[in-house]
């Protein structure tokens, strides 16, 4: 893709998200979602091959269906209240339709099936945008309508997302699919706390975006897409391999890394609200995510997958990719836990 075209497309993607973030009018929000969706499809098809075309088509169909449901919810709400304002009280039917539409855009279970397939079919850079930037707009709308959301519906989708996000990643060998299932699980955690403390959901989102960005950037730096390729990079880029492993353990929520902060704070907040079963379930299902990350770490750092001798040594080429933002991102993705007391201002 030529640089001028890429700049125009990226500007449209950013503009669409910014319109959603700054608007208090339902029609403007919907237009922002449409701008964002139509601009991101060429980014997904950057590598023009059948897999990317299939992934882009799946993404378009899912997002178009979600947009249709969102517009239906907006119309029903307009008929009942006569208001276009987002922060107004919503009609229960409209609220349910909007929640389902936003869940489809986010990839919450049971509307999650497109996320692993689309992520696997596109390049690492496109996958990074899909699993980070594309989560901001739907979550911002959910944040704004959180007082009017049906809590039982959202908790049901959150429970399913955390369970499927952990269970689905267990038998995966493709790193993009592992990160996609991890994204589904993280969306489940965010949806759980949204009802009780929406500000904590934003904290979770920021930490999730930092960890996922760092991981994808290191995979791009390393040109790694499978667990087998990752297990053979120890002799090519030992420092980067060890950083990837730390980031993956942080994504799994292992203390004392940054990924433990949101899980700790969410479980603490749920316990304060006299919920015992939900945080227990979340803690147990978090072990599923941690297990497949630990397995990946073990395979890379402590042992080697079966392979021939000529596969074990890789050529080392000089890497020309710019990594200016990578060091601070890695530091924040792994070492934020001493700053946890500052989060008390959210309460």
Curated annotation (Swiss-Prot):
The keyword Transcription regulation does not apply. It comes from Paradoxurus hermaphroditus. Keywords: Electron transport, Membrane, Mitochondrion, Mitochondrion inner membrane, NAD, Respiratory chain, Translocase, Transmembrane, Transmembrane helix, Transport, Ubiquinone. One of its GO terms (biological process) is mitochondrial respiratory chain complex I assembly. Core subunit of the mitochondrial membrane respiratory chain NADH dehydrogenase (Complex I) which catalyzes electron transfer from NADH through the respiratory chain, using ubiquinone as an electron acceptor. Essential for the catalytic activity and assembly of complex I. It is a multi-pass membrane protein. GO terms for cellular component: mitochondrial inner membrane. This is NADH-ubiquinone oxidoreductase chain 2. The chain crosses the membrane at residues 3-23, 25-45, 59-79, 96-116, 122-142, 153-173, 178-198, 200-220, 237-257, 274-294, 325-345. GO terms for molecular function: NADH dehydrogenase (ubiquinone) activity. Its main location: mitochondrion.
